[in-house]
UniProtKB/Swiss-Prot annotation:
It comes from Synechococcus sp. (strain ATCC 27144 / PCC 6301 / SAUG 1402/1) (Anacystis nidulans). Keywords: Repeat, Ribonucleoprotein, Ribosomal protein, RNA-binding. One of its GO terms (molecular function) is structural constituent of ribosome. It holds the Pfam family S1. The lineage of its organism: Bacteria, Bacillati, Cyanobacteriota, Cyanophyceae, Synechococcales. This is Small ribosomal subunit protein bS1. SUPFAM superfamilies: Nucleic acid-binding proteins.
């Protein structure tokens, strides 16, 4: 048997060539990109994610959700496939850092902008209060309710854990400002059952130099000093005391600003009755309100010329 030496063939393909080939077909991932990846390992500090890069990307536990996460198992499962946001460039080991929180954050702002456009009412639980107001979460975002927009007789600190209906006042992603109003939500709900020219019974809850604030079924309306009486009044204190029960007429409903304007002046049978004898005004309230509504109707029909 004859054996023949076969010369070794130089295939000319080195490790360097293989690395160059990988680089040639490697996708260049950039911070800000959204990619699809697969979870292949969960660790106490985060998770390793296969996104098709040469090195597994890392998802820190603090980037797993817009909400607080204690461990990766709360959010992810091995082999789960989902979207990830590339948070930073490769480190010295060639590893990218990913985020789910950033995706949820962007989508949350998109959602609250949509809700604001729809003038939607949302509900959220107060999780903390401070000197300025109360804090809530909307779609995972932290929102603030100024104290002036909290319509409740409870102390602010007693609101923690309570769910409130809310309207949007300001949605500004660039400044990270999400401001809401409890008062507007209540006023809107109340406004749907109120009409201009309607007489309502309320209680005086506050008195300022410019007028009195009247509680009418859980929402506050303003009885401006100019709408108390036809007679000149130096101060609302000369007519009202806090906790007085009063009859007032609604003269304006401003849903956009969440304001209810009230009047006793329009209910006076004779100018100055509210100063001299309020009981006469309250007794004749429905009769005077009917005249006021008729006047509004005639004005709308162009039958009355206003001065």
């Amino acid at each position: 048997m004859v054996t023949q030496d076969i010369p070794a063939v130089d295939i000319g393909f080195t490790h360097e060539d293989f690395a160059a080939l990988l680089d040639q077909y490697d996708y260049h991932f950039n911070p800000g990109d959204t990619v699809v990846g697969t979870v292949f390992n969960l660790e106490p500090r985060g998770a390793l994610i296969d996104i098709g890069a040469k090195t597994a990307a890392f998802l820190p536990v603090q980037e797993m959700s817009i909400n607080r996460v204690e461990s990766p198992e709360e959010v992810l499962q091995p082999s789960e496939m989902r979207e990830f946001f590339i948070l930073s460039d490769e480190n010295e080991d060639g590893q990218l850092t990913l985020s789910i929180r950033r995706i949820e954050y962007m989508r949350a702002w998109e959602r609250v902008r949509q809700l604001q456009t729809e003038d939607a009412t949302v509900r959220s639980e107060v999780f903390a209060t401070n000197r300025g107001g109360a804090l809530v979460r909307i779609e995972g975002l932290r929102g603030f309710i100024p104290g002036s927009h909290i319509s409740t007789r409870k102390a602010k600190e007693d609101l923690v854990g309570e769910e409130l209906p809310l309207k949007f006042l300001e949605v500004d992603e660039d400044r990270n400002r999400l401001v809401l109003s409890h008062r507007r939500a209540l006023v809107e709900r109340k406004m749907n059952r109120l009409e201009v020219g309607e007489v309502v019974v309320g209680a005086v809850r506050g008195i300022k130099p410019y007028g009195a604030f009247i509680d009418i079924g859980g929402v506050s309306g303003l009885l401006h000093i100019s709408e108390i009486s036809h007679d000149h009044i130096e101060t609302p204190h000369s007519v009202f005391n806090v906790n007085d029960e009063v009859k007032v007429m609604i003269i304006d409903l401003d849903a956009e600003r969440g304001r209810i304007s009230l009047s006793t002046k329009q209910l006076e049978p004779e100018p100055g009755d509210m100063v001299r004898n309020p009981e006469v005004v309250y007794e004749k309230a429905e009769e005077m309100a009917a005249q006021y509504r008729e006047k509004l109707k005639q004005q709308a029909e162009g039958l009355v010329v206003t001065e």
